[in-house]
Structure formats: C-alpha cells, structure tokens
C-alpha cells in the first residue's frame, strides 16, 4: 500500500476515537465512530489470506448495523426533545437501543459472536488495534451517558460477558481467539463497575491495554498463532516463553501480577455497594478464566506437543533484535503491582 495512503488511514483510525471522546454532541460522537470504522476496513484485508476478507465483511456488517441503530436513536431523541444530547427526559427505549448498539460495537455478550471470528481472520497487528484502540470510542460514549441508563441491564450485560469470556476460551487452541474471549471478559469487568465508579472503568481499560499490547507484540515477534507454535519456543527463545507465560497469568488475574489489580479493586468496590452476589459471581468467573490460562501455560511450558523433528536447544543460534517497547510493556504488564503496591490504596 502507498505510504501516504497508509499514513492517512492510520491517522483517521487515531482521529475517530479522539473526536468521539472530545465531543458532547451525539452526532459528532457518531461521526467519530464512523471515522474509525471506515478507516480500519481496508487494513483488515490481507491479500494472502482469503479469510481476512470474510472477517472484514463480518466486521463491517456488524459495526454498520450498530451505527444505524445509534443514528436512529439520535434522530428519535432529537425529534422528541429537540437536542443532540440525551437527557433525563429521553425515552427509555431510545437509551436501551443505544446501549444495545454500543454493546455490539464493544463485543459484549450476547452480541459478541462476531469478535472471535473477526479477530481470528485478521493480521495480528490489526487484532491488537481492534481489541484495544477500537474499544475506546464506544466505551467513552457509555461513560458519558451511563447515569441515564438502566443499571440492571448494564449489570446483566456485564455478568453475561464475563461468563461468556471465561467459558468461550476453554476449548480454544488459536491465540487470537483466546485474546478475543479475554477481551470480552475484560469488557464485562469494565461494565460491571461503571454504574458505581466510572473512574475504575477507565483504570481497568488502561490496565487491559497494558496487558494486551505486549501479548500481541510477543505473538508478532515470534509469528505465533497457535498453542502448538508457542510450545516450540522453548528450544528457540526460552526467555520469551517465560515472559509469555507470565503475561498470560497476568491476563488471568493471578496475584501479585498487574492483572490482579483491577479485579481486586472492582470486587472491593462492589462489596462496598452491597453487591455481594455480583462480586461472588465475578470472582468465580475470574477463577474459570484463570483456569484456562493456567492450562494453556501447562500445555506450552510443561509438556511438549508432538513434532516431526527432534527439537534441541537452539538458544545459541537464535538472534532476536532487542525491542524496547515490548520490554517496557512486558514489565508493566507483569510487575506494576509488585513494584508499586500503593496503587491499591
């Protein structure tokens, strides 16, 4: 692709969520969503992989449907109240339509079915953008309008997403699908605390990005797509395999790694608000999530998949280029809480 065209596309992908976050006008928020949607579609398609075209089509259809629902809600709200922003007088049906559409864009259960399939069919670097940067715009709209939304529906979406994210990742062997289900579960945690403390939603989003980015970078550096390919890293780059194992445990929320921090704070906040049943269910689902990450690490680190060749230690033959960004993010994704425990206070 032409470098100038590529630069324009990436700039537009960056610009869309910025417009949405900085706007108080619903129509401008919608324009920001469309900027990022239309710009990312060409980047999802890989000529060498026909499945990427299918993934891009699924993504476009799902996101376009959600965008139409949001636009319809905005127009109905303007017709009813004569304003481009939701207010206390806004019809509950309009607000529920908007919540459903934003849930589709975020990949929240039960509107999550497109996310694992799309993530599996696109390149790794676009999977990283899809699961991190593309989540910011819809989540920023939710944070702005959450006082008007029905908190019961929000909590139902949250617990369903946490359950589906944990349950869906159990039988997966493809790393991109595992990361997609991880994204669904993390979005559920963000949504669960939104009615009580939106600041914790932002903290959880920031930590989720810190956890997800180095994991995708590790997969890109080693061109690893499956559990089998990761298990073969032990004879090439044992240090990388160790780092991947720690990052997976952090994604699962094992203390004292970084991923434990948001889960700990969110459960504490829910208990302060007398949501004991909700907190208990979320803790149980977190254990299920941690189980499949632990099983994944056991499969890659403590057992060997059958291979056609005799694998020998090749550390002295492997030359890996140092990557400062990956090293920094990997340390942050595992050691932020142990190095700075005052974050929990």
Swiss-Prot record:
Top enzyme category: translocase
Keywords in alphabetical order: Electron transport, Membrane, Mitochondrion, Mitochondrion inner membrane, NAD, Respiratory chain, Translocase, Transmembrane, Transmembrane helix, Transport, Ubiquinone
InterPro entries for the chain: Complex_I_Subunit_2, NADH_DH_su2_C, NADH_UbQ_OxRdtase_chain2, ND/Mrp_TM
Places the protein is found: Mitochondrion inner membrane
One Pfam short name: NADH_dehy_S2_C
Molecular function GO labels: NADH dehydrogenase (ubiquinone) activity
Gene Ontology CC, one term: respiratory chain complex I
Main location: mitochondrion
Keyword Mitochondrion included in the entry's annotation: yes
UniProt feature coiled coil, ranges: none
Topology in membrane: Multi-pass membrane protein
Catalytic activity: a ubiquinone + NADH + 5 H(+)(in) = a ubiquinol + NAD(+) + 4 H(+)(out)
Record carries keyword Ligase: no
Chain ranges passing through the membrane: 1-21, 25-45, 56-76, 92-114, 149-171, 178-198, 200-220, 241-261, 274-294, 324-344
GO biological process assignments: aerobic respiration; mitochondrial electron transport, NADH to ubiquinone; mitochondrial respiratory chain complex I assembly; proton motive force-driven mitochondrial ATP synthesis; reactive oxygen species metabolic process
Its EC number(s): 7.1.1.2
Subunit structure: Core subunit of respiratory chain NADH dehydrogenase (Complex I) which is composed of 45 different subunits. Interacts with TMEM242.
Function: Core subunit of the mitochondrial membrane respiratory chain NADH dehydrogenase (Complex I) which catalyzes electron transfer from NADH through the respiratory chain, using ubiquinone as an electron acceptor. Essential for the catalytic activity and assembly of complex I.
Family listed: Belongs to the complex I subunit 2 family.
Protein name, per record: NADH-ubiquinone oxidoreductase chain 2
Species of provenance: Mus musculus
């Amino acid at each position: 692709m032409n470098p100038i065209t590529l630069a324009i596309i990436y700039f537009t992908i960056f610009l869309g969520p910025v417009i949405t976050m900085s706007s108080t006008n619903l129509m401008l928020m919608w324009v920001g969503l469309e900027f990022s949607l239309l710009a990312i579609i060409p980047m999802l398609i890989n000529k060498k992989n026909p499945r990427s075209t299918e993934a891009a089509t699924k993504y476009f259809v799902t996101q376009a449907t959600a965008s139409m629902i949001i636009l319809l809600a905005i127009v109905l709200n303007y017709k009813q109240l004569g304003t481009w922003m939701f207010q206390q007088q806004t019809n509950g049906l309009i607000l529920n339509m908007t919540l459903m559409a934003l849930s589709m864009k975020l990949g929240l259960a039960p509107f999550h079915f497109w996310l694992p399939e799309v993530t599996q069919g696109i390149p790794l670097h676009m999977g990283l953008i899809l699961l991190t940067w593309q989540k910011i715009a819809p989540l920023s709209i939710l944070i702005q309008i959450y006082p008007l939304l029905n908190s019961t529906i929000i909590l139902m979406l949250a617990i369903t997403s946490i359950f589906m994210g944990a349950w869906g990742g159990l039988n997966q062997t493809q790393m991109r699908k595992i990361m997609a289900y991880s994204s669904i579960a993390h979005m559920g945690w963000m949504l669960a605390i939104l009615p009580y403390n939106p600041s914790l939603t932002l903290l959880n989003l920031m930590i989720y990005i810190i956890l997800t980015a180095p994991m995708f970078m590790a997969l890109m550096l080693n061109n690893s797509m499956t559990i089998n390919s990761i298990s073969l890293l032990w004879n090439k780059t044992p240090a990388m395999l160790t780092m991947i194992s720690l990052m997976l445990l952090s994604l699962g929320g094992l203390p004292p790694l970084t991923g434990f921090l948001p889960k700990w704070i969110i459960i504490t906040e829910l208990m302060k608000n007398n949501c004991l049943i909700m907190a208990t269910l979320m803790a149980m689902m977190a254990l299920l999530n941690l189980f499949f990450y632990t099983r994944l690490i056991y499969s890659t680190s403590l057992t060997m998949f059958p291979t056609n060749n005799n694998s020998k230690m090749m550390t002295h033959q492997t030359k890996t280029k140092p990557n400062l960004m990956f090293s920094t993010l990997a340390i942050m994704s595992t050691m932020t809480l142990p190095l700075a425990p005052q974050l929990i206070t």
